[in-house]
Amino acid sequence: MRLVLLGPPGSGKGTQATRLKEKLGIAHISTGDMLRAEIAAGSELGKQAKAVMDAGNLVSDDILLGMLESRLTQADVAKGFILDGYPRNVAQANAMDGLLAKIGQPLDAVVQLDVATELLVDRIAGRAKEQGRADDSPEAVRQRLQVYNDQTAPVVDFYAARGTLARVDGVGELDEIEARILAAIKG
């Protein structure tokens, strides 16, 4: 099973990806983990990413795609993977689909976790309180959601047009949401 989890900040992508990894016995790939691993390994891509990040810039699509290609050659992805937080824009989605076609591992499903904006703000504010994070003010959260809507929401349309998208209600108990995702990807 090769799966992409999409959804705005606070929708529960990371939580559900961790649960699905255990349930399905497949690798969980997050861009943050990939970046940290490449930088720690001192690879050429890691050095490039570190230089970009140290300058306060976003890592380019080309560097991220190179890291993804490297990650997909590792043994733990042989049974499949869950991508969480990637692709973030249509250019990344196009490039990733090309890469997956080249290596003969097309996506099986793309799941969009749908959660109302006000609930997302409440969830993230609650998480910020628990973790003592000041950068998750309601205003900052709304800004992150706006960036998501501008850049990442078009990826949902991209996969809907290809017939690989399943929309799942991301509200409820964790077990209920997991069951909805499993039903959507097996249906």
From Swiss-Prot:
Instruction: Indicate the quaternary assembly.
Output: Monomer.
**Domain comment, as recorded:** Consists of three domains, a large central CORE domain and two small peripheral domains, NMPbind and LID, which undergo movements during catalysis. The LID domain closes over the site of phosphoryl transfer upon ATP binding. Assembling and dissambling the active center during each catalytic cycle provides an effective means to prevent ATP hydrolysis.
Listed EC numbers: 2.7.4.3
PROSITE patterns for the chain: ADENYLATE_KINASE
| Family membership noted in the UniProt record | Belongs to the adenylate kinase family.
Q: Name one GO molecular function term.
A: adenylate kinase activity
Positions of region (NMP): 30-59
Please state the gene responsible for encoding this protein. adk
Q: What is this protein called?
A: Adenylate kinase
- Summarize the protein's role: Catalyzes the reversible transfer of the terminal phosphate group between ATP and AMP. Plays an important role in cellular energy homeostasis and in adenine nucleotide metabolism.
Catalysed transformations (reactions)? AMP + ATP = 2 ADP
- What is the protein's major site of localization? cytoplasm
Q: What is one GO cellular-component annotation here? A: cytoplasm
From which lineage does this chain's organism come?
Bacteria, Pseudomonadati, Pseudomonadota, Gammaproteobacteria, Lysobacterales
Annotated compartments: Cytoplasm
The residues the record assigns to binding AMP are 31, 36, 57-59, 85-88, 92, 133, 144
